[in-house]
Structure formats: structure tokens, C-alpha cells
Amino acid sequence: MRECISIHIGQAGIQVGNACWELYCLEHGIQPDGQMPGDKTVGGGDDAFNTFFSETGAGKHVPRAVFVDLEPTVIDEVRTGAYRQLFHPEQLISGKEDAANNFARGHYTIGKEIVDLCLDRIRKLADNCTGLQGFLVFNAVGGGTGSGLGSLLLERLSVDYGKKSKLGFTVYPSPQVSTSVVEPYNSVLSTHSLLEHTDVAVLLDNEAIYDICRRSLDIERPTYTNLNRLVSQVISSLTASLRFDGALNVDVTEFQTNLVPYPRIHFMLSSYAPVISAEKAYHEQLSVAEITNSAFEPSSMMAKCDPRHGKYMACCLMYRGDVVPKDVNAAVATIKTKRTIQFVDWCPTGFKCGINYQPPTVVPGGDLAKVQRAVCMISNSTSVAEVFSRIDHKFDLMYAKRAFVHWYVGEGMEEGEFSEAREDLAALEKDYEEVGAESGDGDDDGLGEEEY
């Protein structure tokens, strides 16, 4: 078996996690109490969904997941929510006091008290696996727990499970919408360790997803639930090939191989199509070519950056539902002819495709329409650097005046860590600039228009 363990850290990680597990359960026909009427092999057969669920002797399916937060309120919602019987109580770990939006509290003072307990739980889950493939880590880097405890856990996982791949689904601060003043500090400090300790990180940002909800689903005032349901579709499409049998299956380690040209250049953009409301879907059927095109639309990206400002290095298209390889090849060929979608010249092919015959599932009463086919794209584009340069700029404005720094130093951090993390990010921006530059063959037609 190729099991994956999901780790949900902090409020964002947990709430995205709730949406994901709700969707997985619906997709596999698992009831909220973990029973699965359709499962014929009792006691942990070799079914594909056993990559994400372990099975007890009593036929109950338990997610291979850990939820961690430094304060109890969000996890208490899981403990009392609709899926409370799904999880083992030991999988839900909460502390008593929160990280107060402070990276240093999450990473040093409070985080360090809880991290061993988390690793112990993760170890139990890992021992329960026959061939652990890797970890999916969900967190946000704006707050204190997601950024601080998130990076602490990643660092410790690198020590304990050095060879296993780690995929991060990371919510980054949005350009306009902010939930805390010190977001830029937390993000920069956290990205510093994401650079070292994740193999692939998929960037999400709330503002981009708000806009998708508003524009494509006509939701005037999207809530976090709306956002998370959309994110869970993306994550479900990514992991579908691990949980179902398909024609062109994609492994977690395959993402890494196909998307990451250099170890540091591993921050991905994601998009999903079709995002349409039930009213609209009733009247139209979308072809493979149409959904592929809309996945490449800048407005479909789940992070606020414009792929037209950069170049693609690689991209992974995961189709599900009624899709055949012939349609996919035709759609990809069309994309390659478009002038707006530019690839770096050292990566001529750049597409990895996966097909899964399980059609997309929707949450009853959710916003998305039930469709026959969908595509999720994860792409590695140099335009991601925009996300970092925005955060760096905000970081610089505050750090120049050393604003709020005492809160971090008071929790046992050293001021040198700020500048070290900031330099690391400056180097990352430089790396992106270099991979996007034309290779030295004297052909510099594209250099004039590149703006960074």
C-alpha cells in the first residue's frame, strides 16, 4: 500500500481538513461514523482508498490524519461536529493557549510543548502503514500556529522521516485581505522553513478563492466554508489517483519528479475547472478542451498572481470523470499553440497528465454543480515570485522600523532569524528570476517584456 498521512495544523489547516475529509467520505461512500456499507473486504483489504483510511476489525474506516492546534475552540468543533465519530480522539490534539498570531510562540514557547505529542501520534499512524508514501501538510502561514508549529513539525518530520515526501497545502496572505498585522513576519519566517522542509508546496490565497467564488459561483459574500469546499475539490483531484484506480495514475512522488526542476523552485499554483453553480450547469456540458482552457485562465488561479507575467516550467493536469487520453492530448496540443501561455525554453514538453475515471463528487447543498468531468491543474510558474515579493515588501516596511519585533524576541527568538529568513527569500526571488530568464543562446526576444 502507498499510504499518505495528512497533518492539519492551526485553524486554517483544520478547517480545510474538515472540508477534505467530508468530501473523501462522500466519494468513497463512507458514513460519518466510519462505516462503509459498500466495502466487501472487511479488516483492511487492499482497496485503493486504504491509502487514506485505515480499517479496524469492526469495519470502521478511520482517516490517516492528525489535527493539531494550540487552542481548543477549532478542534472542539471537530469533536462535536457531524464527523466526530470518524476520528479517533487521539488524532485531535489541542493545547490550552493559542499562539496569538506569533510565529515565535508557535515555534518556540508553546509549540515545543506539544510537538512531541504530535510526533508520537504521527509515529503511531506511520507504524500502521505498510508502505508510507509521504505526508500532506495543511496550514496557513499568516497566523502563529500554522506558521510556527507548522514549520516546527516539518523540521521534525525531516529528521524522523527524511526520505518521505512532504506536500504542503499552504494558505498565504492575500494582497488586500489581511487577518493580522504581523502576517508578513510570520509568512517570511515560515517560508524559510517551507523552503528547506517541503518537497512541493501548493500556494493558496483567500482573496483569489473569494474572487473565484464571487465570479464563477455568484456567491456575493463567500464564507470560509465556501472557500474550503473549493480548495477541497482541488486537493481531492490531486489525491484521487491515490484513492481510486484509474487509467493514468499519478503518485505523490511523481508530482515532485515532474514539477520540481530545482529543489528550491517548488512553490506551485493550482487551479480547478469547471467552477460553475448548479443553475448554470443545468444548461451546458463542458468539453475537455473547454475545461483545460479555463484551468489556464489567470482568473482561475488559486493564488493572486498572473501567470502571464512569468513562464511555466512544468504543469500537471489531473482529469477526472468522462475523459479519454485522445481528448487530453488534443487539449494540451491547443494550449501549446497559445501565445499567452509561455514555457521556459529549457523545458519543451512540460505537461504531466493524469486521468481518473471516478467523476467529481459534490457536497450535497454545496455550491458546486455536479459535472461529468473536471480538471485540476498544478503548475510551476515563475510568476509565483509575485506572491513572495509582495510579502517581502510588507515585511521590509515593518522591519525597517523594527515594529512588533519585541513580541518575537520575547518568546525566545533572535533578531538574526528575521534577517536570515528575509535573505533566504530574497535569494528565492532571485532564483525564480534566473530560471525564467532566457538561456544563453542570444535569443532575447522575451526579455524586453518581462516585468518583475
Swiss-Prot record:
Cofactor: Mg(2+)
Enzyme class: hydrolase
Binding-site list for Mg(2+): E71
Binding site for GTP: Q11, E71, G144, T145, T179, N206, N228
Origin superkingdom: Eukaryota
Compartmental location: Cytoplasm, Cytoskeleton
Renumbered residue ranges of the record's region Disordered: 430-452
Principal cellular location given in the protein's record: cytoplasm
Compositional bias (Acidic residues): 431-452
Biological processes annotated in GO: microtubule-based process
EC number per UniProt: 3.6.5.-
Keywords, alphabetical: Acetylation, Cytoplasm, Cytoskeleton, GTP-binding, Hydrolase, Magnesium, Metal-binding, Microtubule, Nucleotide-binding
Record-annotated site: Involved in polymerization: Y452
Reactions that this protein is recorded to catalyse: GTP + H2O = GDP + phosphate + H(+)
Gene Ontology molecular function, alphabetical: GTP binding; hydrolase activity; metal ion binding; structural constituent of cytoskeleton
Modified residues (N6-acetyllysine): K40
Pfam families to which the protein is assigned, alphabetical: Tubulin, Tubulin_C
GO cellular component, one term: microtubule
PTM comment text: Undergoes a tyrosination/detyrosination cycle, the cyclic removal and re-addition of a C-terminal tyrosine residue by the enzymes tubulin tyrosine carboxypeptidase (TTCP) and tubulin tyrosine ligase (TTL), respectively. Acetylation of alpha chains at Lys-40 stabilizes microtubules and affects affinity and processivity of microtubule motors. This modification has a role in multiple cellular functions, ranging from cell motility, cell cycle progression or cell differentiation to intracellular trafficking and signaling.
Residues the record marks as active site: E254
Family of this protein: Belongs to the tubulin family.
Oligomeric and partner information: Dimer of alpha and beta chains. A typical microtubule is a hollow water-filled tube with an outer diameter of 25 nm and an inner diameter of 15 nM. Alpha-beta heterodimers associate head-to-tail to form protofilaments running lengthwise along the microtubule wall with the beta-tubulin subunit facing the microtubule plus end conferring a structural polarity. Microtubules usually have 13 protofilaments but different protofilament numbers can be found in some organisms and specialized cells.
Function: Tubulin is the major constituent of microtubules, a cylinder consisting of laterally associated linear protofilaments composed of alpha- and beta-tubulin heterodimers. Microtubules grow by the addition of GTP-tubulin dimers to the microtubule end, where a stabilizing cap forms. Below the cap, tubulin dimers are in GDP-bound state, owing to GTPase activity of alpha-tubulin.
Designated name of the protein: Tubulin alpha-1 chain
Organism name: Pisum sativum
Gene that this sequence comes from: TUBA1
